[in-house]
């Protein structure tokens, strides 16, 4: 018997059908080993990780050991990325495999699977080292920084090497929006009647460069703009006709697939990845964790065949798209495995995502869309306020659909600016021609703040900043929302009070919050995978940096809200009657403070009477609570010093005869 070990049990049925008799397919169900849960699991100077079987891994490994007794050969067919390579290495270690055959395939089809069996290889230890470095770096930041973060804030909070920079982006965008000051400015639009078509076209006043500067592009004089809108006639200065092309977007990478699923289907990155995982396991799409925006060369023939069948024109030569900076391009873009299949998947999300993937992948090799473009420059026949004013009209008409015959545009964009551009049907004009203005309009404009991030646009930002990798985006989104650092309202992301507290506590104190540092770490991991850097050097550098920052912080930093009694951080605690602040040193320190606008307030001074305690001489306090469970008695203000004396109330005075 030949044993093939894969990651996901969802692939077993499909692979069993492909491989047939003589094969046993078993799943590791992800990682079987990890760093220990209750300790760091790695330490200087060698930073060698200490792994232990996960609770699920113990059962998986026991089952696999039994299967090994019947196996003649073992094929490790975990996923074709760094994570999959690491899982294969851990399986080799746990099962004590002396000569496992490592095979990978980018799609679960008979051709791809059988081709991989013909050319097995050994485990790529450089890629394993890169994954191990990522895991250890995440552990270092989490275990070294989180306790200090909790000390500073008085709350049990966690810091993350990638999640914290993601939260920072959301926090800074929110503050940018709140700090934004609206600028009211003005423009003018002229409208012209086209006698031949009975239509209307428009031209906008050009305020640059005569009326505004590059560093302050807003025209503020409303009266002058209104006068421009009253222009009655213009002279044509120039008229130009040209043709513009619009190329199709590339096929999906992991991040663009998540963005398109969010924008077009309304599903979050995690749901998109879950649907893609199922489609991959069912054999409908290629491997969906990739940053390569190009289809495989072998797919071109299939794309051309489907395009001809659909009556679509293909591009003159195969298209190649530029990969993002730092992309690993280890696997082709996300595409269908059987291009002629129009519908695939078991659920509505899977079917909708498959359709997006297929049409986008076909469109990438279709001909450009073409537009007829007309541009006319106009000048007012008479100066306005002694100044010559010019206008420009630009119109675009689709004359050849090309790839737009198949898909409407780039589904990753929240708003497709190209499609918003008006056709503006400008007639043929001759330089020197005088045109009458049908009507004018004063444009009252105002600047807009940047939009809040959505999960789609945050993924796009993370990718552009080089933060994270295809396999991590969905987990980042899920973590920052599920842990309460970011919340979603009508698809937009807002920081929570906790998220802002984390960012304020870490920024300026730890370098891993800087986007540039996070990007450098990703590049270091890439170099480890390529054999250009060593694991130990990368880990030691980050470890030393964190140690230095923690030492500096512990010497200089004080808690944001220190206890006035012991100096430990105060914590904001929900109570029956709202929030209050208590000392994190409880029960050793039981000081509390009222909550005032999310911050510790001042305790009201204790109101004492002129009556003295007969036991210790301290002033008495009149303690009254009305309603259910109420009370009315006198107590000693020396309670904390040990005097427990109480007195019954007698007509608003302590009854010294009834002392307890």
From Swiss-Prot:
Annotated site residue numbers, Interaction with DNA: 31, 134-135, 138, 143, 289, 483
Catalytic activity: ATP-independent breakage of single-stranded DNA, followed by passage and rejoining
Active site: 287 (o-(5'-phospho-dna)-tyrosine intermediate)
Class of this enzyme: isomerase
SUPFAM superfamilies: Prokaryotic type I DNA topoisomerase, Zinc beta-ribbon
GO molecular function list: DNA binding; DNA topoisomerase type I (single strand cut, ATP-independent) activity; zinc ion binding
A single Gene Ontology CC term: chromosome
Region (Interaction with DNA): 158-163
Domain Topo IA-type catalytic: 124-550
InterPro entries per the UniProt record, alphabetical: Topo_IA, Topo_IA_2, Topo_IA_AS, Topo_IA_cen, Topo_IA_cen_sub1, Topo_IA_cen_sub2, Topo_IA_cen_sub3, Topo_IA_core_domain
Coiled coil: none
Keyword Metal-binding applies: yes
This protein's UniProt keywords: DNA-binding, Isomerase, Magnesium, Metal-binding, Plasmid, Repeat, Topoisomerase, Zinc, Zinc-finger
An individual GO BP term: DNA topological change
Assigned EC number: 5.6.2.1
HAMAP family: Topoisom_1_prok
Oligomer status and interactors: Monomer.
Protein's name in the database: DNA topoisomerase I, plasmid
Top-level taxonomy: Bacteria, Pseudomonadati, Pseudomonadota, Gammaproteobacteria, Lysobacterales
């Amino acid at each position: 018997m030949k044993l093939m070990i894969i990651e996901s049990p969802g692939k077993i049925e499909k692979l069993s059908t492909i491989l047939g008799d003589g094969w046993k397919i078993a799943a590791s169900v992800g990682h079987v080993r990890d760093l220990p849960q209750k300790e760091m699991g790695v330490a200087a100077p060698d930073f060698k990780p200490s792994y232990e079987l996960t609770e699920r891994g113990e059962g998986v490994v026991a089952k696999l050991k039994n299967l090994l007794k019947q196996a003649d050969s073992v094929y490790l067919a975990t996923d074709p990325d760094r994570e999959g390579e690491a899982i294969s290495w851990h399986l080799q270690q746990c099962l004590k495999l002396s000569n496992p055959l490592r095979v990978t395939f980018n799609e679960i089809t008979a051709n791809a699977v059988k081709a991989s069996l013909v050319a097995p290889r050994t485990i790529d230890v450089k890629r394993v080292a890169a994954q191990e470095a990522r895991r250890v770096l995440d552990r270092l930041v989490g275990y070294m920084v989180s306790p200090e973060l909790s000390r500073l804030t008085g709350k049990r909070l966690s810091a993350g090497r990638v999640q914290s920079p993601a939260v920072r982006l959301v926090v800074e965008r929110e503050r940018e929006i709140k700090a934004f000051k609206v600028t009211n400015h003005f423009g003018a639009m002229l409208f012209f009647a086209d006698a031949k078509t009975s239509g209307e076209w428009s031209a906008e006043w050009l305020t640059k460069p005569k009326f505004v500067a590059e560093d302050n592009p807003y025209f503020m004089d409303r009266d002058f703009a209104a006068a421009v809108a009253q222009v009655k006639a213009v002279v044509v200065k120039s008229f130009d006709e040209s043709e513009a092309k619009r190329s199709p977007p590339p096929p999906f990478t992991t991040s663009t697939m998540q963005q398109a699923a969010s924008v077009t289907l309304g599903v979050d990155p995690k749901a998109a990845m879950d649907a893609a995982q199922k489609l991959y396991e069912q054999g409908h799409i290629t491997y969906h964790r990739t940053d390569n925006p190009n289809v495989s060369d072998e797919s071109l023939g299939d794309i051309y065949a489907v395009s001809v069948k659909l009556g679509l024109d293909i591009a003159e030569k195969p298209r190649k798209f530029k990969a993002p900076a730092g992309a690993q391009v280890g696997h082709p873009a996300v595409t269908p495995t059987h291009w002629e299949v129009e519908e695939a998947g078991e659920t509505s999300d899977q079917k909708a995502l498959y359709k997006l993937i297929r049409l986008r992948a076909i469109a990438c090799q279709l001909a450009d869309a073409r537009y007829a473009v007309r541009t006319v420059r106009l000048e007012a026949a008479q100066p306005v306020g002694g100044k010559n004013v010019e206008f420009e009209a630009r119109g675009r008409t689709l004359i050849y659909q090309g790839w737009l015959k198949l898909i409407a545009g780039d589904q990753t964009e929240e708003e497709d600016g190209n499609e918003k551009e008006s056709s503006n049907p400008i007639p043929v004009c001759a330089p020197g021609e005088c045109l009458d203005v049908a009507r004018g309009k004063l444009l009252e404009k105002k600047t807009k703040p940047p939009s809040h991030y959505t999960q789609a646009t945050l993924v796009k930002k993370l990718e552009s900043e080089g933060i994270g990798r295809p396999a991590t985006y969905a987990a980042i989104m899920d973590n920052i929302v599920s842990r309460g650092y970011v919340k979603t309202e009508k698809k937009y992301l807002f920081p929570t009070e906790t998220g802002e507290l984390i960012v304020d506590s870490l920024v300026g104190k730890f370098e891993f919050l800087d986007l540039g540092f996070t990007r450098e770490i990703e590049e270091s991991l890439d170099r480890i995978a390529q054999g250009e850097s060593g694991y130990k050097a990368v880990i030691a550098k980050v470890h030393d940096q964190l140690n230095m920052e923690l030492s500096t912080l512990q010497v200089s930093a004080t808690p944001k809200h220190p206890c006035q009694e012991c100096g430990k951080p105060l914590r904001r605690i929900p109570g029956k009657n709202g929030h209050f602040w208590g000392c994190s040193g409880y029960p050793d320190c039981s000081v509390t403070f009222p909550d005032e606008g999310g911050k510790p307030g001042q305790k009201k001074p204790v109101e004492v009477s002129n009556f003295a305690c007969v036991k210790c001489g301290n002033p008495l306090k009149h303690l009254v609570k009305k309603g259910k469970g109420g009370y009315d008695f006198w107590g000693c203000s020396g309670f904390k010093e040990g005097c427990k004396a109480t007195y019954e109330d007698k007509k608003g005075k302590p009854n010294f005869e009834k002392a307890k």
